[in-house]
């Protein structure tokens, strides 16, 4: 274990050695500016209170200096910025009383040995039920990941005295329409502003294209939320869109597909209503607490490798204990296994079935595009509505109702049309 812990820091020093940030050690000259170790902590609350986040840094080493000559208290600044951003974003996104525990100036290998600013962030307690209700949620993981990214960005730019720009959020309301010109498709979407970060506005977009079962191309840069493309009849085309600015590129949109039949008889609309990503089913009673993977293992973003096994210890009185029977104890049957999640690529699967059926063309869209009037159901004689594992779950913060109230009204109107 000591070799493992020390190797992390020594690897950083070897990579950054001979760079401007670590000029006094031999190495590969990679200009690494800081290092952060993301940990989970132990500890539990019997009253379902949040344990929260802790930051660790070390100043009492190398005469209080880092190898570039700056004060080791730069590591404290890094920890402070990260904890502030994590707490702020979690509280605003989840209305959760997320706790900022403290900052420890202590002698830990991962914060003592690196020659550059370094911190350990103990994000949450893996032993605490309240923390893990959020910790298993892929939406929470995205929020935390983005908060950490923003915190690192703030720290690095403050060291250089420069302003920063945060990469945009993913686009929404993605839709494919049949073009006005022969054998063309028109793609539309909406760029999203980040209410937590005014610099994250999208400036341009990249449209990625896939033909059939091939891979996506390197993308086409467009300045507006619109893209027209000529297609070859008989081939299924798939698209995904990212937003970009000077800060970087967003996560991709869902993948939508379209197909122009060679001898078109009719046109079909595929609506992707499967947006859900979530943690496993929650058990929360006065006597029992935990996660029921057998009832519902949740829906990871793409996939998940974080489960050891099915939970067997649910007794609240055994919180804080270890071993069989303790709260949170599980089997090991899922160790090393990858759990399938939401690929956001199901209009292609449904579309291939439509292609095989004969002379039917199709386009696809997000359910938000229908709800917001961008796509009209009445324009299509057949609508294929994908729901997958979509469902409403009171235990989760995100809203994944299968048919929202606006969608219910639109479907009713379409059926009466």
List each language-model region with its residue ranges:
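Pro/Thr/Ser/Gly-rich low-complexity, intrinsically disordered linker/stalk tracts
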Residues: 155-199, 233, 248-266
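Active-site-adjacent mobile loop/cap segments within catalytic or ligand-binding domains
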Residues: 19, 35-65, 93-162
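Beta-strand-rich modules
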Residues: 228-249
């Amino acid at each position: 274990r000591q070799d493992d812990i020390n190797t992390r820091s020594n690897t950083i020093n070897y990579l950054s050695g001979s760079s401007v940030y670590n000029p006094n050690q031999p190495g590969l000259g990679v200009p690494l500016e800081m290092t952060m170790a993301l940990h989970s902590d132990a500890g539990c609350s019997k009253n379902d209170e949040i344990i929260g986040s802790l930051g660790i840094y070390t100043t009492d080493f190398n005469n209080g200096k880092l190898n570039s000559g700056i004060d080791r208290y730069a590591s404290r600044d890094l920890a402070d910025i990260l904890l502030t951003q994590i707490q702020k974003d979690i509280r605003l996104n989840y209305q959760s009383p997320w706790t900022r525990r403290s900052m420890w100036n202590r002698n830990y290998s991962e914060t003592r040995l690196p020659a550059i600013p370094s911190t350990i962030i103990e994000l949450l307690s893996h032993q605490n039920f309240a923390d893990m209700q959020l910790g298993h949620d892929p939406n929470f993981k995205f929020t935390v990941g983005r908060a950490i990214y923003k915190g690192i960005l703030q720290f690095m730019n403050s060291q250089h005295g420069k302003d920063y720009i945060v990469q945009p959020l993913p686009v929404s309301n993605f839709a494919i329409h049949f073009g006005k010109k022969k054998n063309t498709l028109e793609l539309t979407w909406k760029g999203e502003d980040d209410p937590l970060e005014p610099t994250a506005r999208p400036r341009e977009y990249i449209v990625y294209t896939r033909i059939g079962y091939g891979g996506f191309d390197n993308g086409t840069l467009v300045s507006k939320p619109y893209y027209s493309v000529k297609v070859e009849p008989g081939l299924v085309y798939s698209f995904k869109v990212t937003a970009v600015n000077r800060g970087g590129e967003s996560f991709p949109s869902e993948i939508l597909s379209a197909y122009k039949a060679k001898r078109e008889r009719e046109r079909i609309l595929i609506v992707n209503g499967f947006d859900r990503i979530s943690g496993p089913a929650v058990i929360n009673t006065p006597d029992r607490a935990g996660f029921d993977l057998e009832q519902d293992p949740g829906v990871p973003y793409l996939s998940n490798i974080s489960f050891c096994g099915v939970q067997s210890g649910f007794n609240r009185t055994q919180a804080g204990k270890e071993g069989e029977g303790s709260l949170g104890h599980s089997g090991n049957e899922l160790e090393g296994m990858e759990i399938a999640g939401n690929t956001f690529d199901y209009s292609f699967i449904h579309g291939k079935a439509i292609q095989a059926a004969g002379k039917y063309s199709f386009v696809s869209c997000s359910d938000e595009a229908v709800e917001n009037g961008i796509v009209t159901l009445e324009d299509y004689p057949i609508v294929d509505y994908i729901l997958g594992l979509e469902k409403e779950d009171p235990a989760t913060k995100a809203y994944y109702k299968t048919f929202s109230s606006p969608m219910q009204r639109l479907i009713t109107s379409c059926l009466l049309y």
